Amino acid sequence: MSVFLSVIGALLLDALLGEPKRAHPLVAFGRLADRLEQHFNGAAGRGWRSHGVTAWCLAVLPLTLLAWLLSLLPGIGWLAEIVLLYLALGLRSLGEHALPVAQALWRHDLPEARRRVACIVSRDTSQLDEEGVARAATESVLENGSDAVFAALFWFIVAGAPGVVLYRLSNTLDAMWGYRNARFERFGWAAARIDDLLNYVPARLVAVTYALLGRTRRALRCWRTQAPLWDSPNAGPVMAAGAGALGVVLGGAAIYHGELHARPELGRGSAPQARHIEHALDLVWAGVGVWLLVLLFGGWLYA
């Protein structure tokens, strides 16, 4: 089966089913990652970088090998590829989590908006005003659109089922271990660096996609001038280009785990509102359409 048809199949499954309501494989993987971290690192953060590399290899490589073997099964390998890509995607989930935030803001129900946005961001949301909630949700849509949708598609297109499994598991470990604190500074180093490497090309393709679908010149200018100021080498281009494309100002100070972080501003334009959350989702969905067209054209060109 062609890569294009496999991607279409996975996107249809995601649209119809969404994330599995019970026993998502990533939940089981998270429990495995917790046990590995407790063994190699512990609450005291005694692990070194080498322990983190070992734990990462034990968590990711056997499952990547399994994905490769499943994709080779006669007759049903194509189905395994579709299912594995579906499990790695989060397009429908992105809307299911972000749209209720926008809807609460349209109703001016700030407590509900705070409660909803707390489900998708790690910052402290208890004191956010409506603008702060809209900013947090819009940032989440732009960044998670890159991580949970476009990067998964990229690695499936490049390396099939093993590629997307390797990427999704690596991204999950970065979310669990990639903190810059006493416990994970050394142990989580490998998970963070590998995720940065795997996201480097997809993030820049996403930034180009956002720019082409929005205010292109402003998006490219924001990417060039603002992204280098952001602390993440991949989130910076994605969010700066996305904010510029939407004509909104994102970034700025935010509280994480009780500490105030002075973040630079990203984008240019108006203050974030409920409509910007919806426009960010539109940007992601339109971007998926563009990628499908490029994939279809590429398949036809090299058929």
Curated annotation (Swiss-Prot):
Pathway(s) served: Cofactor biosynthesis; adenosylcobalamin biosynthesis
Key words of the record: Cell membrane, Cobalamin biosynthesis, Membrane, Transmembrane, Transmembrane helix
Source taxon at top rank: Bacteria
Membrane topology: Multi-pass membrane protein
Pfam family, one: CobD_Cbib
Subcellular location: Cell membrane
Tagged with keyword Ubl conjugation: no
Keyword tRNA-binding tagged: no
One annotated Gene Ontology cellular component of this protein: plasma membrane
InterPro entries for this protein: Cobalamin_biosynth_CobD/CbiB
Function recorded in the entry: Converts cobyric acid to cobinamide by the addition of aminopropanol on the F carboxylic group.
NCBIfam families: cobal_cbiB (TIGR00380)
Family assignment from sequence similarity: Belongs to the CobD/CbiB family.
Protein name per its UniProtKB record: Cobalamin biosynthesis protein CobD
Organism per entry: Stutzerimonas stutzeri (strain A1501) (Pseudomonas stutzeri)
